Amino acid sequence: MLYGEIDRGVFGKIRGSMQYQNIVEGKFLDRPNRFIAHVEIEGKEETVHVKNTGRCKELLLPGVKVYLEKSGNPNRKTAFDLVAVEKAGLGLVNIDSQAPNQVVLEWLRVFAFEKLKPEYVFRDSRVDFYMERDMALPEAFWEYGEREEINGKEQRVENIRMQHQEILNVSGNIRKYLLEVKGCTLERDGIGYFPDAPTERGVKHLRELTKAIQEGYIAILAFVIAMPKVSMVYPNVETHKAFGDALEEARQAGVKILYLPCTVTKEGMWISS
């Protein structure tokens, strides 16, 4: 897997991307546990590593088309990593649990932060990213193309611009950011939902972000939407009500919520908004 490729979008946006190597197509058969699956590849059944320990039960259905990255390590027990699934009526969904953080890291590197630290220790947790930026620098470090270039999507792009600029409103000489990333792969009727399984860790992260607001940080929760045709994420309260409650408490406390739709291909993924 390659990271750090920088790509300019059609509207002048700059986006970090990631790319897989040695991708092969297969047919999903079954999943005996969280870590492995049985997949038919070129007529042969293979035991493969699933790069997502979540349930993914709406995606990993018998017979669906999946995409796998072939490992270059001959000593591995499994020769393939299952990274993406075709969902009927939706398209390609990236289920690689490492992909959201990697894509966001490359995306953030484009913007002029004085500091950018992954896996930052805050209190008794690790937050995905810590960033610093001088107040003297321009606010709009998320850059978007001119509105007239958006071909009918002016209002949405302007709303995104306003949302991202709102995040920057803070007093002091240095803006200090804490950003937690959550990957969303669950879709129902065009809406993304998170989580797809109970996540006490996710609840803890939200509570830490809420505390960070009280200490003067700009706290952000970013949902990386690893599938097409989805631009919003709702809390999946049917699966984990506590996460939904913690998300609402965090929002009311001032934690900013970002929705980052992605373009997904079998070879990779990048943030498209």
Show which residues each predicted segment covers.
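Short, charged beta-turn/beta-strand-edge "cap" motif at the junction between a beta-strand
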Residues: D30, K70-N75
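Conserved catalytic cores of phosphodiester-cleaving nucleases, focusing on short active-site segments
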Residues: G26, D128-G145, G152, N169-D196, ...
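Beta-strand/loop nucleic-acid-binding surfaces
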Residues: E45-K57
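Domain-level recognition of nuclease-like catalytic cores that cleave nucleotide substrates
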Residues: G16, M227-S273
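Short aromatic-glycine-enriched beta-strand elements
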Residues: R34-H38
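Nucleic-acid nuclease catalytic cores
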Residues: V181-G183, E187-E200, R207-T239
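Short nucleic-acid-contacting surface segments enriched for D/E, G, S/T with interspersed K/R
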Residues: R55-Y67
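Acidic-basic catalytic patches of nuclease active cores, encompassing PD-(D/E)XK
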Residues: K57, G89-P118, A136, W142, ...
